[in-house]
């Protein structure tokens, strides 16, 4: 195993998975994926794959997938290749999309075709990484059959090479070759041995197989040691697990060999990343022995691991979040390892603020000295609270967050990183106090440093001393993902001079925001105009992405945020309109109408049509709801109502003479048979001025309606879905109280006396032939001035857009 190639120890990796895509591997692939492939991806990714983790195409780990088949796949190509990606989440989706087909009649597979394509990918990686330099190259072969004794034919560069020639070529180029197979095939072991890098003396390989039938030959990465009972997919070994002085070692500790321990540091100091594997192996042995001692001793006895086998531990504590305090041995300077499958598998979606409990060879902090007198046992499953801080913490699925531990330390900057800039980062957040105004903003700032990889040319001499950051909501990250491509990646590190601001930064970046837009003012003569600060909840680091295409990125993020604001404003307008509609419906409907609605929830009167639609009831089956009726400007609506009230006596006088032969007027006490499909109406429609307003707007053209009702035509336009034509069987001619209704040839009119009871209206009336006429008026879209004005005033400029513009 190459000790100089830890997963996230600052070395950028190029990883190619070469997988047999035949039915011979299909039944075993899920087990291999679960036990080996996902842990390997987490090893290179620095944590479980997350959809919001983005890395630059030229600055992070690159993954590529090659799927090869057998000779019976003709006329299809022997190999399918996926272009490189820097997203581990996307790569896992590629793995899940493989269709294992064919190969049932073949005893071999076209491994030579797959390896030749993989070598071509590494050639492409070399061109892509010219600015970065040397990278850590890994090729992983996953198959269940030996290779054909045939040379590669589909590759242009490596055509004619046999499988053995290709693996030798892989070793000569310094590519670490690994083999994962569900069976122990001698031919595959021979390929692994021939692919040994030139001049490298390998130690005895470890047994990483989780099943005795599997053959796992690994080079250039670290997997969980074989025989573990833990569920795969735990935190990869490159993330150091902090060691609190807990007396409890759960039985599931056997999975701990997959975790490294960082070297010792004084309390509350930065923790450098572990670059050797011997420490992890020693920690694994001590953890297993501690688990055995836990089973052999009494429940109230707390065994200590052998100090000769225990590696030095860091001052970073494991996060805890619930009482009671742990029982502490008096020798608090002796650390103990506590890991469990449950805690390791806890999702990392919680805020990254942790209460720290530190131990080490040096003097113990005050918190531990205060707890030293307590010797009571604590069950293994019980969460524990640190003595100081009082800050709630997530489960230990976020082990590497030194900075957030009361935040006094932070995830370290790798030793091979170079300091590029040092200054202050400033941002605004909403105060946590409930009594503070919602529009109030709290300005915070923190000293920070920007680190780059060796060899990267980042001109920061013209950068301002203070950088202003605007927070980006978490829901926009997936939309902004494509904009993060083709970017240079830097690492931000914050000092702990202002603990309150550091807490606030981790709180907001770990809960509702996971990104910030750092804008460089135009007054500074630097080439960078915008920088995206991302927080990786898995890696517990702040990454800065500097887009190579600055103008394109600015335009893209401006468009994304503008669209997001428009969607938010539309939701706010809809909620406001629904609230206004409910207020109108409950405040202006007569009491007798409301009482009827309570008794007859299935029947909907005309007078209730507009407000009740806002409450989810429909006028008739299939009719769409209309929120436009309630979206008029309040002042314009009041003026229209007053205007119509003045004109009503004139309407009554003008409509009295044309009463003729077919007028159907009903006395107060007489029953009336309503037409099938006709809408019900309240006893006194005139008691509601807004509904009377709507009814008057529906007068047929033959009744001389004054032209002063024209301002309400746009209201009628919006209500067309509520007042359908004859095709829907709805006949709704309405008249104001006190007016005789006129039935002209080809029309059906109804009139109801104010004193008539609702029960009589439920009877049926014979249908009257004729056509239904609607009031004349403009049918095109009529602008709603009041609504447009409200929308124009309600769209506010976002802080990020202001800075970007």
Swiss-Prot record:
Residue ranges, compositional bias (Low complexity): 647-678
Record's subcellular location: Nucleus
Listed Pfam families: Med25 (PF11232), Med25_SD1 (PF11235), Med25_VWA (PF11265)
Motif segment (LXXLL motif): 691-695
GO cellular component labels: nucleus
Region (Disordered): 308-332, 647-691
Protein function: Component of the Mediator complex, a coactivator involved in the regulated transcription of nearly all RNA polymerase II-dependent genes. Mediator functions as a bridge to convey information from gene-specific regulatory proteins to the basal RNA polymerase II transcription machinery. Mediator is recruited to promoters by direct interactions with regulatory proteins and serves as a scaffold for the assembly of a functional preinitiation complex with RNA polymerase II and the general transcription factors.
Listed name of the protein: Mediator of RNA polymerase II transcription subunit 25
Gene name for this UniProt entry: med25
